[in-house]
Amino acid sequence: MILNLTDISDEPLQSQISRQVRAKILAGELGAGDNLPSIRGLARDQRVSVITVQRAYEYLEREGLIHSRRGKGFFVSELSDSAKKEMAKTRLLETLQAPLLAALAEGLSKADIQQIVQLLLAQSGDN
């Protein structure tokens, strides 16, 4: 599995791993039942500690995105479309919260922000 990790980011490596694996699952690049790389294997390939990968996998497991089978490794869990949609909504909310509060603090009105969101949606096409 190819991940793009960087140590110059403020984001911890375990968060980068979990975020990128989550994105691959939600985008369908990794499907239900797919076997994930072993913790040691991914740590070796990405040149990070085993603990870093273990923590990333534990986080993804708590989210319900992956599960472990004793002695066999980690696998992508079966997710309903509604579960995927709810996860995407949660991630969007988490991503937008800080910039939204900053925009309000800088004097933008709710109407200004709604106009910007509508513009972005219009630019994104029919999705």
Regions flagged by a language model, labelled:
Residues 16-21, 37, 52, 66-69, ...:
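Short alpha-helical segments used as structural interaction elements across diverse proteins
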Residues 62-65, 123-127:
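Short, solvent-exposed alpha-helical "recognition" segments
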Residues 36-67:
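N-terminal helix-turn-helix
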Residues 29-34, 61-71, 75-78:
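Beta-hairpin "wing" of winged helix-turn-helix
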Residues 10-12, 28-29, 44, 68-73, ...:
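Short hydrophobic/aromatic-rich motifs at helix boundaries and adjacent loops
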Residues 1-35, 41, 90, 94-126:
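Extreme N-terminal segment that seeds HTH/winged-HTH DNA-binding domains in transcriptional regulators
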Residues 14, 38, 72-88:
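Short, cationic-aromatic polyanion-contact patches
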